[in-house]
């Protein structure tokens, strides 16, 4: 373990820290991913120190050169961590001193690890959100373009997992695409707050050296700077927001996964997953398990747990910095990794999914058109409640006769209502059924086509903002 002389804060204390305490305190394994962004922030801060006359130009050049060397070592995987490195910030500081000597100590002038940690995390999440957004938009695009290609496929729509009305397969796909566009918008909103720069806030009271925070903002390509130093070092709203957005996104992906799991069962047989996203059974050779979709569904629970955990961490801490905040990185970075993987798998599943059109058509049984029978009577002038009752009587009559509703004779229907005429035969067509829903957002072909065009335009805008 590290000696007292090695410790960053060792001058205040006598004796050594319990080794178990050092293990509990260390976050180096999680924080190694912050290496590059910490180097970027350190380079920017060094330039600000030079502008404030704390560093000479020669010292600045040495520090920048040393940081570039560390960046190179990190990218090659040869940056060595030692037992004295409590976190990535101390590891970089230690390595910089090894490379350029005591001048390295000047880099921390006026800068605390409190602001370093939150700055590094914001910089990493800024780029992470861009990656997640790219994958999310690709998934939405895959859903939309598949909907455009398969617009003529009609299937049963369900409520309570019971057959309800005929809909277009494309209407189903677009329902998920639309939900995901809201997630994309929310990611953009979170990014606005992540790109507010806390660097220059010091340990809690601000920076005493007239550091140019606008220079820091410009160097790090952030949108604005934090307003209050105490709030800047302690706020983790952006972590909660990102995980909250991820939670909603995972709810939507879990719903998509569950729908497709159901549709892929032999009882439904509407879709077949690609072998690339399925597994077999060690004992049951006939089975094709939708593991990819089941994992997407289960990963939602993992993300929900991370949200609950970070909320519990934050709810009891006082203002400024507490060691509790060390838990933020593991939580949010795990969520980032989960989303990145899940979105790519979901896109792969959708892009390779086989549609079993014949099975969908077989499932379009005549009782699905019972509502259309009621609408027929409404168009003849009957109030909707009476029309629904009449339709229900027709269903009951068909059941009594042991036939399907479309096999009732005109005389049978007239016994229920004199408004039924020979044109009632047009009701018993699934194409006619879906085509009556022409209002915006409906399942008629014209409406679905309009949805596709609107989503394509929305994707263009969101891609520009990602």
From Swiss-Prot:
One example GO MF annotation: structural constituent of eye lens
GO BP terms, alphabetized: arginine biosynthetic process via ornithine
Source domain of life: Eukaryota
GO CC terms: cytosol
SUPFAM superfamilies assigned to the protein according to its UniProt record, in alphabetical order: L-aspartase-like (SSF48557)
Gene3D superfamilies associated with the record: Fumarase/aspartase (C-terminal domain), Fumarase/aspartase (Central domain), Fumarase/aspartase (N-terminal domain)
This protein's record includes keyword Hydrolase: no
CDD domains membership: Argininosuccinate_lyase
Transmembrane segments: none
Matches recorded under Pfam families: ASL_C2 (PF14698), Lyase_1 (PF00206)
Expression (tissue specificity): Eye lens.
Keywords, ordered alphabetically: Eye lens protein
Family classification: Belongs to the lyase 1 family. Argininosuccinate lyase subfamily.
NCBIfam families: argH
Function: Delta crystallin, the principal crystallin in embryonic lens, is found only in birds and reptiles.
Subunit-structure text: Homotetramer.
Name of this chain's protein: Delta-1 crystallin
